[in-house]
């Protein structure tokens, strides 16, 4: 009986160790199986703009963080000479990308954004839906679409 108890305790401990190991390993998802879409937007800073670059970036970033829980990632990357910016955005799916666009265009940030920046390139990666493409086209955005051939996300 004593050996049987030791046996069951040993099995229990080993099974718990495996669960911890499995829980700590991140899941790997192939890019081609993900619904997420990303925006890579190249911008030139308009030198005649009176808008404060750092202040604007902080303000709009805080707004997206507070109001758009469907936004996975949102970041501005500024060149050393502060004349160019790359804006990287990632959304859970195309519908979320449309919702972000609607929110942005209806906000006070829209005019301020285009006063501060000139859009030079707009790339969307991932499975952009026809509805997303229609929405952006109807609103004057010229976009290069790129689909995943291979890759992964942990």
Segments predicted by a language model, with ranges:
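Short S/T/G/P-rich N-terminal loop/turn motif that feeds into the first structured element of a domain
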Residues: 16-85, 92-102, 115-154
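Conserved serine/cysteine hydrolase catalytic core
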Residues: 112
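Sec-dependent signal peptide recognition
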Residues: 2-7
């Amino acid at each position: 009986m004593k050996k049987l108890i030791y046996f069951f305790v040993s099995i229990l401990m080993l099974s718990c160790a495996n669960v911890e190991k499995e829980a700590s390993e991140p899941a790997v998802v192939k890019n081609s199986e993900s619904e997420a879409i990303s925006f890579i937007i190249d911008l030139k800073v308009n030198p005649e703009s009176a808008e404060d670059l750092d202040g604007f970036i902080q303000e709009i970033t805080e707004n997206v963080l507070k109001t758009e829980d469907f936004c996975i990632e949102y970041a501005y990357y500024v060149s050393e000479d502060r004349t160019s910016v790359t804006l990287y955005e990632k959304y859970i799916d195309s519908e979320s990308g449309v919702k972000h666009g609607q929110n942005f265009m209806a906000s006070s940030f829209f005019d301020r954004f285009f006063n501060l920046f000139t859009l030079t390139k707009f790339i969307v990666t991932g499975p952009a839906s026809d509805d997303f493409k229609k929405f952006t086209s109807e609103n004057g955005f010229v976009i290069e679409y790129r689909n995943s051939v291979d890759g992964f996300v942990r």
